[in-house]
Amino acid sequence: MADVYIIYAKENRATALKVRDYLSASWSVWLDDFIVGDFNVAIKESIQQAKCVVALYSSFASKPAVTGELSLAEKYQKKIIPLLLDDSDPPYPYGHLSSVDFRSWPGAIDHPTFQLLQKKIGLVVAPRAKPARLAATAGGALALPNVFMSVSSHETQFDPVDALSALRIHATSSILVSAYDLIHSQSRDAMVEEIQTYRDNGGFVLIDSGNYEAHRLNDTRWKPAHLKKVLLNTPHDWAFCFDNMKPSDKFDVAVRQVVRAVERDAKHTSAPMLPIIHIKQNEAGLARLPRIVRAISEQLRPPIIAIPERELGAGLAQRALTVRQIRDELDKLPYYQSIHLLGTGNPWSIAVLAAAGADTFDGLEWCRFAVDPSSERLHHFQHFDFFRAKRLRTDLMDVVDADEDIGYAGKVAFHNLEYYGEFNRLMREMYSTGDTESFALGVTGLKSVELRKLFPGIFL
């Protein structure tokens, strides 16, 4: 007995197959691939036994084969969820059903359109398994898990425009840029030019709200209008909303504050606007957090939901446990919701928090510290001399070492970027095969028994 039966015209078979493949991660799905015996009998029995019907509506859906199956679905009182594939009228007389607009669906499982379908099916029949971790998001443009290389003027070794230049030259896959610097930097025009060139070369740009810098500098004049200006004048793929740094301690109000912030800032960009959640820094705040994240996911269905790592608990063990609690709550949804941790660039932290259930991270570590690739530990920037001989042997680093015009800071930065590029690649490769613990063991150098003792419930 299948959970979901898909009705479609043969002209829409490619879409039907993709929908079937994606839904099969959480439900049993019937498609007419493997009919044995009488075709009509098999269809009638399968519709009768199915718990939910998904029907593809297009200009081809008025064919008798489609309307006949719709008639059977109504006869057996099945819940029918139409997917509108084009601008044609629904097949008569089945235009009264609540539908999902698939006309602009790009074919990605993490798209809000497909998540709405998953949510509707979940109201009829519960998923058989928790949603599968995504291998990519943003329509495949951003592989997961992922560490964004951040750019900021606050306590880093580089002016933002120089940092952007290094990231462009390195061809780093994804970056996070603070809106604060895109307003206050004297080089903001050059920054925008660097960002445009970076995107033209295939890079992925995430704009941050700028509240991190404003908070650190005690700048009370930083307002949503500043972010609006940045969104209107800076090329980007995603943007974080102007987050509310003083959240309510009431559940409903806290959720509403985040949703309103996203809706306000989304008016100024065609790119996805992403929520940032802050919580009261107490036991009650941490206890509410998983439910708040889930509620915001259900209302907005954003590509990612961001939470500052520093607000997840006092130590890494507590933070990992909080992430796991959030993931457990999100796993009750019929679709996968990705989590972003703000300010997480330490390799050891990433290895543990990704295993706990986080998907994307960002950090300034690449332009603040020097990474020892053998221990995967961070050191003072000037301590690069202790392990520069251990650097990754890559063509880029050979060029960097040979170029006398690249100063000490530049050599450290490119060394770090090469490290994080390989870190990202290896993390994705091992996560694709479920080797989350093996990845953490490799990064930290700990033994399995030590890792499990330190982080109970994360590594089993």
Model regions: which residues?
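Short beta-alpha junction loops
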Residues: 59-60, 84-89, 209-213, 244-246, ...
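Glycine-rich phosphate/ribose-binding loops and adjacent secondary-structure elements
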Residues: 271-399
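Conserved N-terminal substructure of TIR/SEFIR domains
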Residues: 1-56, 74-78, 84-88, 92, ...
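Short loop/helix-cap segments at secondary-structure boundaries that form the rim of catalytic
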Residues: 88-97, 353
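Conserved acidic residues
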Residues: 51, 173, 237, 303, ...
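C-terminal extensions of enzymes
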Residues: 127-155, 159-161, 393-460
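A cross-family glycoside hydrolase active-site/sugar-binding cleft signature
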Residues: 7, 32, 147-150, 176-180, ...
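Non-catalytic, usually N-terminal nucleic-acid engagement modules in DNA/RNA processing proteins
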Residues: 127-270, 428
